[in-house]
Structure formats: C-alpha cells, structure tokens
C-alpha cells in the first residue's frame, strides 16, 4: 500500500495519471529484504590445543573448526564457509654439552607443520542490480515471490514462444518463481536467483618448516632450514537451464570444474659468527638460499548434463566438435638461487 501511494503521488506530481486505482487494496506486499536475509545466520567456532615442555622437547598441537552461514544465501547453501585447521609446533634438543665442551656442543631441531582445508560457496558481490541483494533492495513490493494459480499459467503462456525460457520452480515447495517485467531492467527475482546452484570452492594447504641449529664452536653456529608450501584449490559446479529475465537466462546446461596446484620450497644454509671484544661486537654471516615455485591448472566445461543429480563433466554429452566441450591447462615454474 505505501509503495502504491508513493508511486501515485509521484505520477500526480509529474502530471500523469496515477497507476494504482485502489492503493489501499494491496496490503503489506512483499518484503524482499526479509525474504532474502538469513536471519540469525549461525557461526560455529571450536578450538582445542595441547602443549607441554621438558628438558628435551617443547611441543604444541592445536586443531580448529569454523563454519559460518552467509547472511544472504546461507539458507540456500549459496553463501557458506567451512574451515578445518591443524597445527603442530615442536622443538627438540638432541644434545646439549655446552657445559662440558666448546665444540659441537649442542644441536636443536625444530619443526612447524600446518594444514588447512576450506570449503565455501558465494554469490555475486558488488553488483547494484544483478545480484540477489541488489534486486532485493530495488524490486517493487507489488511483485510476489511466486506465480500461483492463474498467474502461473499466465507466465507459462507469456513465455511459451521465448526460445531460452525455462521456468524455475522452488525445490523446497514446487512453486513457480515469478519473473519481474522488463521495466525492472537487470533486476531478477532474488529468491529464484538464490535457488540456482552456485560454484563450490575448495582448497587444501600444507605448510611445513624444518630447521636444525648446530653449535660448531664458541660463537660459531650453523643453521639449515627447509620450508615447503603445497596448495591445491579449485571450484566445481554446474549451470542448469533457467530464465530469470530477458538477457539473464541459460539455454543449455553446463558442468564445469577447475583445479590448481602450487608448490613452493625454500632451502637456506647460514653460518654465523659473533664475537665481543670489550665494548665492540663483530658479526659475520655467510649464507646460501634456493627457492623454487611450481604449479599447474586444469579447467574443463561440458554442456548438456544428462541428469542434475549427477552434474559432472563425465555425465554430460556435449562434444568439442559442436563447441559444447572445452578444456585448458598449463604448468608454471619459477626458480631462484
């Protein structure tokens, strides 16, 4: 009702006829923001750690698990985040004879290990009109989330001859989603948008650092360290047939997958000498470092999914000769010394 009254007032001020004859008959209308927002989106965070020390060993082990549902799309599994982390930090004193001799008198070994696994989904961000949130902010409350009864049949009849039209039904209740008219431009029914499957992002990251420090002589130390970073990440998903608006439709189903991997390792050897004479301190450092970064990626798409319950590339029928199958990939390598 408030929207209809404001639109009528705007029309009168512009010198044109009011659009709504009985604005008080429309009631509350659709609160699109209320429909879109995931109220009380849950956040869960668990942390556990164990630590201890002795004359020979210092150690810390920890694990964490974190999940968060998105405020927009979280209840549609379109905006969610999950992270698992594991960490281990240990230091070993293999021997310490510094009180008995001044050569080869101590050796310490350190290891730091960590692992992180992340799974996430996300919706389009930073879009004024095309995103679910942008549409929820600007759509008319006179529109309904669903077309039911005669309105549903009217939609099917209206778009029957539109070549890329595929109706979208809510998987939760089987109702037909409404389609905003052309006067709303790029805006779409945000609930229909959120009901579509989004890309599922994933990553695995392993980080390991090892070092050993040997006391060679008084004031003379040798330290060697090795670090490795292994990362694997990508996304998988599919696009079904759908029609949200003119210019916002998919006339063919597509399965896609993208995978990346990267490895970075670094080796350092350092010889250190420190000497203090009266009020003067001298330091000499001799070092060597080597680093290598390698990686690769592989991406593929294939159209014509046979069954949405198995939306995978190997369960689709598209052929490369018809332009319905693509693949790409490449390695990479950078090394320094």
Regions found by a protein language model. Name each.
Residues 1, 18-49, 62-75:
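Short strand-turn segments of transmembrane beta-barrel domains in outer membranes
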Residues 1-28, 73-81, 85, 91-205, ...:
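Surface-exposed loop/interface segments of Gram-negative outer-membrane beta-barrel transport/assembly proteins
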Residues 36-37, 46-49, 210-211, 273, ...:
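Generic recognition of flexible, low-complexity loop/linker segments
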Residues 42, 53, 101-103, 214, ...:
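A generic structural signal for short, solvent-exposed coil/turn residues
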Residues 45-76, 85-91, 110, 209, ...:
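Predominantly transmembrane beta-strands of Gram-negative outer membrane beta-barrel pores used
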Residues 220:
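An active-site-proximal structural segment forming one wall of the substrate-binding cleft
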């Amino acid at each position: 009702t408030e929207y209809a009254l404001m639109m009528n007032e705007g029309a009168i001020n512009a010198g044109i006829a009011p659009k709504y004859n009985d604005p008080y008959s429309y009631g509350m209308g659709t609160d699109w923001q209320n429909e879109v927002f995931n109220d009380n989106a849950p956040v869960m965070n668990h942390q556990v750690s164990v630590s201890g020390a002795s004359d020979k060993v210092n150690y810390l082990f920890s694990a964490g698990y974190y999940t968060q549902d998105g405020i927009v799309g979280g209840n549609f599994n379109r905006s969610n985040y999950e992270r698992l982390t594991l960490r281990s930090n240990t230091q070993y004193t293999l021997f310490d004879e510094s009180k008995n001799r001044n050569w080869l008198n101590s050796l310490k070994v350190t290891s730091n290990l960590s692992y992180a696994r992340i799974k996430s989904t996300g919706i389009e961000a930073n879009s004024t009109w095309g995103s679910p949130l942008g549409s929820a902010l600007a759509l008319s409350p006179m529109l309904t989330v669903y077309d039911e009864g005669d309105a549903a049949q009217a939609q099917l009849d209206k778009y029957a001859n539109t070549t890329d039209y595929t109706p979208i039904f809510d998987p939760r209740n089987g109702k037909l989603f409404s389609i905003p008219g052309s006067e709303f431009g790029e805006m779409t029914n945000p609930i229909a948008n959120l009901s579509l499957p989004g890309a599922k992002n994933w990553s695995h990251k392993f980080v390991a650092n090892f070092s050993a420090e040997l006391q060679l002589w008084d004031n003379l130390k040798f330290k060697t360290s090795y670090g490795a970073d292994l990362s694997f990440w990508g996304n998988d998903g599919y696009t079904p047939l759908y029609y949200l608006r003119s210019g916002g439709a998919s006339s063919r189903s597509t399965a896609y997958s993208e995978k990346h991997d990267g490895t970075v390792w670094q080796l350092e050897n350092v010889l250190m000498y420190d000497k203090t004479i009266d009020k003067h301190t001298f330091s000499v450092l001799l070092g060597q470092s080597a680093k290598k970064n390698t990686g690769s990626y592989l991406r593929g798409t294939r159209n014509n999914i046979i069954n949405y319950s198995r939306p995978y590339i190997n369960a689709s029928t598209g052929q490369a000769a018809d332009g319905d199958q693509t693949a790409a990939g490449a390695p990479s390598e950078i090394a320094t010394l």
